[in-house]
Amino acid sequence: MSHYGSYYGGLGYSCGGFGGLGYGYGCGCGSFCRRGSGCGYGGYGYGSGFGSYGYGSGFGGYGYGSGFGGYGYGCCRPSYNGGYGFSGFY
């Protein structure tokens, strides 16, 4: 099980890889995107990622990460704490 996590600009939730796949890229604030996955949306860009592989897609008020579409790598459920996003397996 590998783990990839980081936060950007104080607000931004990260996604951790699971199932031995080791995929999952940190989501950025605003419209920031990292390697075509974890694209931001909804102002703060909580863990959104739509596309052929669907890395770390986000939804809901705080955009808890949930992989779906294609292979759906990099699911996570980060905690919201003082405006910072910390990654964690869920």
UniProtKB/Swiss-Prot annotation:
Tissue and organ expression note: Detected in the upper portion of the hair cortex.
Quaternary structure, from the entry: Interacts with hair keratins.
Organism encoding this protein: Homo sapiens (Human)
Region (26 X 2 AA repeats of G-[YCGS]): 5-84
Record-stated family: Belongs to the KRTAP type 19 family.
Keywords assigned: Keratin, Repeat
Descriptive protein name: Keratin-associated protein 19-1
Transmembrane segments annotated in the record for this chain: none
Function comment: In the hair cortex, hair keratin intermediate filaments are embedded in an interfilamentous matrix, consisting of hair keratin-associated proteins (KRTAP), which are essential for the formation of a rigid and resistant hair shaft through their extensive disulfide bond cross-linking with abundant cysteine residues of hair keratins. The matrix proteins include the high-sulfur and high-glycine-tyrosine keratins.
Coiled coil segments of this chain: none
PANTHER family reported for this sequence: KERATIN-ASSOCIATED PROTEIN 19-1, KERATIN-ASSOCIATED PROTEIN 19-3-RELATED
Highest classification ranks of the organism: Eukaryota, Metazoa, Chordata, Craniata, Vertebrata
One GO CC term on file: intermediate filament
One Pfam family per UniProt: KRTAP
